[in-house]
Amino acid sequence: ENSMLKSVMADAKKGDSFMRQNRIKKFLTAGLSGLLILSLTGCGQAAKLPETVENTSLVVEKDGKVTSYLVNTFDKDFYNLDGLTQMVEEEAEEFNATHTEATENPMNVKTVQVLGDGAMVQVVQEFADTDSYAEYNEQDLFYGTRVEALAQGLTVNREFVNAADGTPADSEKLDKALEKNHLIITNASAYIYCPYPVLYISEGVVMGEDGYVDASQSDGVVT
């Protein structure tokens, strides 16, 4: 009788954790905008991350590693910090377990913490590369050259504006930039911190004052 009760409780717990996991997925997803493309220069100062990240942000490193900062309202009716941390870590373990061929974990949880007065929570995850980020979050994120983008079947449209002032890009200069520099292509709604200064951006995207790209409201450009 006791073992029967145990298994019923275990099932109830499973159902509960499944529901909670669905909630956590919703909570953790950065959200989708249209596909946006950023063309980067090959040198210069990259955007500087603030000391406390209070907006959902993606940081792409020169070697393609990605740090994801997810910031959301902390609903104490649904989560407590320990439970949230446990769920985030379990999801990471499950994701990494499906990638046993990888030499390093595709994803690691860095921190789960409440910000400031406790109204917001921030989850920081590190991804080995843009593909791992894209797969885990079911979003698009590409960092590489135009040739690599085309090889992956991504179309690079040419509806760019100058990052500096929002004026339409000069097509000759744009071609040169696209030939030799890196691109970031994504549909994540987030502040995007690029490894190099941004030269050209899709229409509908805003440059932040510290050099980041504000794609949090954007419909981007669907390519």
Predicted regions and their residues:
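N-terminal Sec/ER secretory leader and immediately downstream segment
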Residues: 50-111
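Bacterial signal peptide processing site
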Residues: 44-46
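Bacterial N-terminal signal peptides that target proteins for export
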Residues: 20-31
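Mature, soluble, non-transmembrane domains
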Residues: 113-223
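Short, Lys/Arg-enriched N-terminal segments with co-localized hydrophobic residues
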Residues: 1-18
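C-terminal motif of bacterial Sec signal peptides marking the signal peptidase cleavage site
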Residues: 39-42
